[in-house]
C-alpha cells in the first residue's frame, strides 16, 4: 500500500512539572507536543514515524472532525506505549519507531490534530523528546490494469471440424501411411546385398531366356 507524507506543524513542547518546583529535585517528567495540519483537510492517518530520544512511554490523543454542528473532541488513541523497556537503561532510547493505524485504540479517520504525551520517570536523563516526526496518510490507489477481452474471457476448447462427406478420415489415413512406412523400412532392412544376374540361373545361362532377348 502506498503512503503519502502529510505536511504538519509541530508546536513547541510543553513541560509538566513532576515533584516540588521549589527544590532542585523537581524536574519535568511529562512533555506535551501538539501537531496540527493547517494546510490539509481532515484525513485518515495511516502511520506515525519518529526517532525516539530517551522517551520511556508515549500516549497519543487525536482530535477528529465529527460534523458541522458538533465540536471536535479529543480521544485517546494510544496509551502508555513502551519505547524503553527499562527507563533507567539505554535500550530503545534512540530507536526509530513506526506506529500504524491498526495499533490505535480508535478509528483514525477525519484527523484534525494530534497530541503526543511523552513520559520519562527516570531521573538519569537530562532531557527527552521525539525527533524527525513524520505523519502519513494512504496514497492514491494504483490504476487498475485492463486486459483484452479475449484474455479476460478465454475461448472454450475448440471442437474438431466435422468431416466432409466423401472424404476419408484423416486420422485413419495417417495411421495407414505410418504402417506402410514401417513395412517399407522392414523390407529395406532385410533386402539382400547379393546382385542376381538378369539371366543367371544357378551359375548357368538359360538358352531359352537368351533367345527371347
From Swiss-Prot:
Its main location: nucleus. InterPro entries: Nicolin-1. GO terms for cellular component: microtubule; nucleoplasm. It is found in: Nucleus. Keywords: Microtubule, Nucleus. Part of the neuronal tubulin polyglutamylase complex which contains TPGS1, TPGS2, TTLL1, LRRC49 and NICN1. PANTHER family: NICOLIN 1, NICOLIN-1. This is Nicolin-1. It comes from Canis lupus familiaris. The gene is NICN1.
Amino acid at each position: 500500500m502506498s503512503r503519502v507524507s502529510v505536511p504538519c506543524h509541530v508546536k513547541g513542547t510543553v513541560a509538566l512539572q513532576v515533584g516540588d518546583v521549589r527544590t532542585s529535585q523537581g524536574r519535568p517528567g511529562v512533555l506535551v507536543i501538539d501537531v496540527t495540519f493547517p494546510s490539509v483537510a481532515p484525513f485518515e492517518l495511516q502511520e506515525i514515524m519518529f526517532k525516539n530520544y530517551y522517551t520511556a512511554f508515549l500516549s497519543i490523543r487525536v482530535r477528529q472532525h465529527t460534523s458541522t454542528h458538533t465540536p471536535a473532541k479529543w480521544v485517546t488513541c494510544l496509551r502508555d506505549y513502551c519505547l524503553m523497556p527499562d527507563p533507567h537503561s539505554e535500550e530503545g532510547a534512540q530507536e526509530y519507531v513506526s506506529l500504524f493505524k491498526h495499533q490505535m485504540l480508535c478509528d483514525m479517520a477525519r484527523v484534525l490534530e494530534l497530541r503526543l504525551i511523552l513520559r520519562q520517570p527516570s531521573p538519569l536523563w537530562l532531557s527527552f523528546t521525539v525527533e524527525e516526526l513524520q505523519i502519513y496518510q494512504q496514497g492514491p490507489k494504483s490504476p487498475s490494469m485492463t486486459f483484452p477481452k479475449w484474455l479476460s474471457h478465454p475461448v472454450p476448447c475448440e471442437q474438431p471440424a466435422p468431416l466432409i462427406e466423401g472424404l476419408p478420415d484423416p486420422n485413419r489415413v495417417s495411421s495407414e501411411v505410418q504402417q506402410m512406412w514401417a513395412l517399407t523400412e522392414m523390407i529395406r532392412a532385410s533386402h539382400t546385398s547379393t546382385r542376381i544376374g538378369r539371366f543367371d540361373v544357378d551359375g548357368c545361362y538359360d538358352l531359352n531366356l537368351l533367345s527371347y532377348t
